Every structure is written in C-alpha cells, then in structure tokens.
From Swiss-Prot:
This is NAD(P)H-quinone oxidoreductase subunit 2. One of its GO terms (cellular component) is plasma membrane-derived thylakoid membrane. Belongs to the complex I subunit 2 family. It is a multi-pass membrane protein. NDH-1 shuttles electrons from an unknown electron donor, via FMN and iron-sulfur (Fe-S) centers, to quinones in the respiratory and/or the photosynthetic chain. The immediate electron acceptor for the enzyme in this species is believed to be plastoquinone. Couples the redox reaction to proton translocation, and thus conserves the redox energy in a proton gradient. Cyanobacterial NDH-1 also plays a role in inorganic carbon-concentration. Its main location: membrane. Coiled coil: none annotated. The chain crosses the membrane at residues 11-31, 42-62, 78-98, 106-126, 132-152, 167-187, 206-226, 240-260, 276-296, 302-322, 330-350, 374-394, 396-416, 462-482. It is found in: Cellular thylakoid membrane. It is an enzyme of class 7 (translocase).
Length: 527
C-alpha cells in the first residue's frame, strides 16, 4: 500500500510528516494532562521519537514523485523536503538540550514540548506553503509559539523582557508583511496562489515595488537581516538557551525557505530589483553582525551577532539565484544546523553547571572538562570557517557560487568578514584552553564534576557527540551533501532549472590559485 497515494484531489500524502508531528503533539498534550509525574518524564522521549518519525517520512517522501497537495496550497518538492528536514532536525536537538534545562529550572515540562512541536509544525508548513493564506497562518503559528517559548521561564525578568521585545517587533514585522500580501492580492485580482499572483500581476509598476519592499521587510525579520535584526541580541541573551538554539536555526531555516519560494515564484519579473535590495542587505548584515560581535562579553550575545553575520553569508546564495547559489544556501544551512546547535549544547551544559555565559568565566575550562572544551572549540572554529571543518566548505561553496555569478563585491565582503569572525571565535577558544592555573576563572575553579546519569544528561551528551561528529565529518563528506542539494534544486519546478546535472565542485580536489584579488576554482569532471 502506498502511503503517499492521492486522497481525492488533495494528495494528503504530501503532509504525512506534518501529520506525524501533529499526532506527537497531541500525544504529548494528553500525557501531560492526564499522566502522573512518571509519565511526564517520558515526554522528551515521546517528542524525539515523533520527530524522528517525521524525518523518516520525509526520507520516504524524497523517493516519491513530485507532490502538490491541497489544490496547490502546499508543495512537497525536494527543496521543501530539505527545509522541513532542517526544521525537524533542529527540534530534535533542541529537545535533547531542553530536557536537563527544564528539569533544573523547575519550569512546567509538557507546555514547553507542546510549544516546540507547534513551532516545528509552523516552520514545516511555512517551508512548503504556496498560498498566501497558508503562508500567513504558518508564519503566525511559528511566530506565536516562538514568542511564548522566549518567555517560558517567566520568573526570570530577562526572559519576560525578551518575550515582550520579540512580540512587539514580531507583530510589527507581521503587519508589514501582511500589508505587502494584501497589495499582491489586490494587484493580482484576488489570487492567493503564488504562481497565479505572478501570472496575474503583469506590470504592477510602483505598487508592485512597494509590495516587494514590504514583503522583504517581513521576511528580513525572520532572517535577522540588517536592519530588521534589532530583536536578535536581546532575545538571544534573555531567552532560555534551548529556545535560542531553535530560533537560531529552525526559525531561520523556515525564513529562508519562505524567501526562496516567495521571491522566486511571486516576483520573477522583478528579479533584478529584489536581488539588488538583498545584495545591500547582505553586505550590511555581514559587516554589522561580525564587527559588533567582536565587542561582546557574553557568549550567547556573541552568537546572536554571529547568527546575524551567518545570515548575511547565506543570503549570498539567495542573491545569486543560480543552481549553485540555491544549492550552496541549502548546504550551508545543513552544516550550520550541526555546528551552531553543537555550540548551544555546550553553552547549555556550562550554564547549567556555573549559572553564567560570560566569556571570561570559560577561562581554563580545558583543565576541568576536556570533552566540553573539544566540542565547543570544534563548533566555534567551524562557524569561523576553518578547514577542514564543515563551516569551511559551506562558505567555500557560497563564495564559489557568488564568484561564478559575478557577485564579486558580495564575495569580497564575505571573505573579509569571515576573517573578522575567525578572530572572535578563536578568542573564545583561546580563553577556554589556557593552561596557567592562575588564569582559571572562579566559575571553572568551582566547576562540579559532570553527572551524566542525572535526568536529561544522557540526551545532552548524545546531542553533543552527534553534533561534534557531524561537524567534523560533514566537511569530509561535503561533496555528497552538496550533490544532494543540487539535486533538490534541479528537481523543484518552481525554481525553473533544467533537471540536467549541473557542474559540482569536488571538495576533495578543489584547487585554489591566487590570481589577482581572488583565486579561481577548478572543477574536475564527475567520473
């Protein structure tokens, strides 16, 4: 029996992964309401198993023909599948780091997992939405659940402040985006399907430009792109660390999925205009995010500005708009998931044991916790783009795609800001690995021994090991992952690329020859 067979003309099999997450959400809710304390301890495991089940259905869906469901409102094309997988993978690792965090903070358990699964569901639907109504509902589902999670530890004033700021700025950005969508609805004569809007608008003139700017403003908030980034540092610093981890990858991945589909489908006649606007935003985002990060003294706030800068790097692939550009965007988000969440897993463990995330308090950690030091150092160095880690190949593919497309300014700014980012990442690593006893911080001097048998600690350790291994080996196996991304781009009709195999740079044999301002990359033929 084919579980993805059409149901009437709805093709309901396209949303099987979302159905699995919904059933998991309902099960968690019921167990939390009617179960005892022993049953509630199983909620993290239930959530993880349900999310893994959703990943399995996404893998099965990859092997099925192109599906467009619910009368064209939702697409299960390969690009959608990869972005939905990113959101679900982020949720899995978030549960792993949240179990111990919630147990130690004393906050209600069930509510957090319900909110996390709701946000995951919103992000998954947003990744495949092809209708204005579904786009808005998905965006609000993800947004409202994220606001509530940001203020989850309501007894902490910083968490409440972060949630309020996130809510106010998020509501404003939603209103801007909704106004842009209303203009599109009017200009297209009442169409709600993205493709129908593009074909019905014709020459929209000034009104079309205004709609484009408003939509970019709403999407820019989700990407934390400058100048829509003001919420990021305060929300990252004040929110619970597992929530910050989810927002930094899951919410951002859903935002990029929306940006790729919305801009490529609705505004093909204004491609030059939106690429010009995003080019400026990408440059500002890379520069501000990486420069301001240098001055930060708290690791979560440093990673907030780092995530802004990382969004600027990913925007290069969006601006380029070629097969290699979109594929490098997807590939970078795949490796960003493991290296960024790996860093947050380490921050979670350290903050649970010391109660701080001040960078100076990490001084001398190598002497007390070599495993944590190794994981955090590898993840930070990968974020900086040092070879042979995953982050290096992610940036290499992005810059290669930009250079091939003639986006020389973007690539040069990306290279310079990457060097800047290496400085502040290495500064943290240097602080961690100092060997002089007199340089050890007070928090590290009083650092308790890790009890890996305590509630939530096994899951935290598994998450750290998984992200550490993935960060190392994703660099070595970068070419198969990039090939997967290329295939997804080619097989997604809304991007308009032929299905013929595009040239792919072999990571094992990329040769860089310094020739003037930048080297040229040679690509051997696929054998």
């Amino acid at each position: 029996m084919d579980v993805f067979a059409p149901t009437g003309n709805l093709y309901a099999g396209a949303i099987w992964p979302e159905v699995v997450v919904t059933l998991t959400l309902l099960l968690v809710l019921v167990v939390d309401l009617v179960g005892g304390s022993a049953a509630r301890k199983s909620l993290p495991a239930l959530s993880i198993f349900g999310l893994i089940g959703a990943l399995v259905t996404l893998v099965l869906q990859w092997q099925q023909p192109q599906l467009e469901s619910f009368l064209g409102s939702f697409a299960a094309d390969p690009v959608s599948i990869l972005f939905r997988g990113l959101v679900v993978g982020t949720a899995v690792l978030t549960v792993m780091m949240a179990e111990r965090y919630i147990a130690q903070s004393g906050a209600p358990t069930g509510e957090f997992y319900v909110l996390l699964l709701t946000a995951t569901l919103g992000g998954m639907f947003l990744s495949g939405a092809t209708d204005l109504i579904l786009v808005f509902v998905s965006l609000e589902t993800l947004g409202i659940a994220s606001y509530l999670m940001a203020g989850y530890t309501k007894r902490d004033p910083r968490s409440s402040e972060a949630a309020l700021k996130y809510l106010l700025i998020g509501a404003s950005s939603t209103a801007i985006f909704l106004y842009g969508m209303s203009l599109l609805y009017g200009l297209s004569g009442g169409q709600t399907k993205l493709e129908a809007i593009a074909s019905s608008m014709g020459d929209a003139g000034l009104a079309g430009i205004i709609a484009l700017v408003l939509c970019i403003g709403g999407i820019g908030f989700k990407l934390a792109a400058v100048p829509f980034h003001q919420w990021t540092p305060d929300v990252y610093e004040g929110s619970p660390t597992p929530v910050v981890a989810f927002l930094s990858v899951g919410s951002k991945a859903a935002g990029f999925a929306l940006a790729v589909r919305f801009l490529a489908t609705v505004f093909p006649a204004m491609t030059e205009e939106w690429r010009a606007v995003l080019s400026v935003l990408a440059i500002l985002t890379m520069v501000l995010g990486n420069v301001v990060a240098i001055a930060q003294t708290r690791l979560k706030r440093l990673l907030a500005y780092s995530s802004i800068g990382q969004a600027g790097f990913v925007m290069i692939g969006l601006v380029v708009g070629t097969e290699a550009g979109y594929a490098s965007l997807i590939f970078y988000l795949l490796v960003y998931l493991v290296m960024n969440l790996g860093a947050f897993l380490c921050i979670t463990l350290f903050s649970l044991k010391t109660g701080t995330d001040e960078i100076n308090e990490y001084s001398g950690l190598y002497q007390k916790d070599p495993f944590l030091t190794l994981c955090l150092s590898i993840c930070l160095l990968s974020l900086g783009g040092l070879p042979p880690l995953a982050g290096f190949f992610g940036k290499l593919y992005l810059f290669w795609a930009g250079w091939q497309a003639g986006a020389y300014t973007l690539v040069l700014v990306g290279l310079v800001t990457s060097v800047i980012s290496i400085y502040y990442y290495v500064r943290v690593v240097k602080t961690i690995v100092v060997k002089e006893p007199q340089e050890m911080s007070v928090s590290v001097q009083n650092y308790p021994e890790t009890n890996w048998q305590a509630e939530g600690m096994p899951a935290l350790r598994v998450g750290m090991v998984l992200t550490l291994v993935a960060t190392i080996f994703a660099g070595i196996l970068s070419n198969p992952l990039f090939t997967l991304s290329i295939q997804a781009v080619e097989q997604s009709p809304f991007l308009g690329f032929p299905t013929a195999q595009a040239p792919i740079p072999e990571s094992a044999s990329l040769q860089v020859a310094v020739d003037g301002s930048l080297g040229s990359l040679t690509q051997p033929s696929q054998g």
